[in-house]
Amino acid sequence: MKIAIISDIHGNLVALQSILSELKKADRVVCLGDVAAVGPQPHETIAFLRKARWPCILGNADETLANSKRESYAQIPEGDREKLVSLDEWTESEIDAADREFLSGFKPTIEVKGGKLSLLCYHGSPRSNTEQILPTTPEEELDRIFEGKNAQAYAGGHIHSQMVRKFGTSLIINPGSVGLPFFKASDGRAVNPVWAEYAVLTTSGDDLKVELRREKYSKRNLRDAVIESGMPDSEWWLRDWV
């Protein structure tokens, strides 16, 4: 059995479409949330996911959009904060009531079972879609996060960074971000690489194989989508894509 795991599309349908041929090879696809906000194609991405009928987790950005709330961006420098608020306002204007209803139907967690595989999916953690599970999260904190859980594998997004780490006899997996990945450049800046990140889990008997994948796509196609969308501060949004 082959399961593709995607997360954090963030309204970048160009990135999602670049991996679609690979996703179609999987027996199942699970989306870990944050599908529409902060990108150029929020409505189009939701429409695609509605048609795809993949099970989706409720990310923190999905919950905010579904309830017409706003992020505070309190930790963001003022100039960038104003641009993000403007982008959120634009995103709200781009989606409709049906889109919000669709987002509201996302689940906080999803259990996937197949053969001997038991997989628990969430956005941030099983207990909160804003909690971060990092490569450096202490084992004792993981014990609290996964208390009462007994899955062979756990999969979450939110941090926009790929990860596989052992936790007891289980694996904790983060597929990274399809539409808004980032890494620290040599000068310390956070930059967005033009690739789509995802994970593929393959089960055979008792064995579980995890592949963290990255697929490059066209920066020109992304730029064209951003300009065509009419999103505010488009050049600012594009400046860190490399």
Regions from the language model: what does each represent?
Residues 1-4, 111-120, 167-171, 207-209:
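Beta-strand-turn-beta hairpins that frame and shape the catalytic cleft
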Residues 165-242:
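Acidic, His/Gly-rich catalytic cores of divalent-metal-dependent hydrolytic chemistry
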Residues 2-100:
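Core catalytic region of metal-dependent phosphoesterases/phosphodiesterases
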Residues 78-82, 115-148, 183, 224:
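Active-site-proximal segments of metal-dependent phosphoesterases and phosphodiesterases across multiple
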